[in-house]
């Protein structure tokens, strides 16, 4: 029993159909052929009851090769009748799918990278950035509690030649620098209120000295020495400032008494204030300490003079 493939035929209008008559003829012919083959006989008079398998396989292979060769030109004819609009739509859909797959792969890579960075930060102990508080988080706990408002404001992209006049009700107020809340800053009052911090600084300096003495790491010791030197210089500057203010206060007190006696007021200049400050400073020193201070000052002045001299006049 032989089989044959049904091939579509393409007409001029592009519509394909199958030949039913040919199929029927082929089927009838195949049946008749089978009967002839079954009742066939050889030349020598001997009869046989079936086809030989080898001849049947060869016929099938030959028919398959012929049908493939016939289908190729038919497929090309069918493709030639496809409109350009259909081809363009197919091409767009292919490009869209390719872009979508690329964007998905890129998005997956970004999420994986972010997850790796977050895990690395957690392993190193780095705290994540604080996110901006939402409106629900900024709500007050009670109506008597102060309202919390974000200080972050977007910077305008437009250049403002003249600053706009903002009403007092809409102007932002920082309570740290608001005179209505804190009042006017007075350095004397501030120093008096926070004078207890000087005792804390003295304790810190003592602890630093002990740590420098016990430390065996040279790099750490140098860092602690720099910190201690900075604290000592700051304390010395504050003491000199307080001493200068004390000299000015005493001078003003004497001048007030002289004004009451009918004399004209005398106002100290900066140079006179420095002289009075040095005189009071040297009066508290003994002879040896005074000689050391004067010797240091002499050396300092000589070095300044040498720096101001031309190179040709500098000697040894």
Curated annotation (Swiss-Prot):
GO process annotations (BP): maturation of SSU-rRNA from tricistronic rRNA transcript (SSU-rRNA, 5.8S rRNA, LSU-rRNA)
Pfam family, one: RRP36
Record's GO cellular component terms: 90S preribosome; nucleolus
Start-end of Acidic residues biased regions: 52-71
Protein name per its UniProtKB record: rRNA biogenesis protein RRP36
Family designation: Belongs to the RRP36 family.
Coiled coil: 202-309
Function in brief: Component of the 90S pre-ribosome involved in the maturation of rRNAs. Required for early cleavages of the pre-RNAs in the 40S ribosomal subunit maturation pathway.
Superkingdom, natural source: Eukaryota
InterPro entries cross-referenced by the UniProt entry: RRP36
Organism per entry: Tuber melanosporum (strain Mel28)
Protein localization: Nucleus, Nucleolus
Oligomeric form and interacting partners: Associates with 90S and pre-40S pre-ribosomal particles.
Region of interest called Disordered, as start-end residue ranges on this chain: 1-110, 131-158, 228-261, 293-316
Feature: compositional bias, Basic and acidic residues: 94-110, 228-248
Keywords: Coiled coil, Nucleus, Ribonucleoprotein, Ribosome biogenesis, rRNA processing
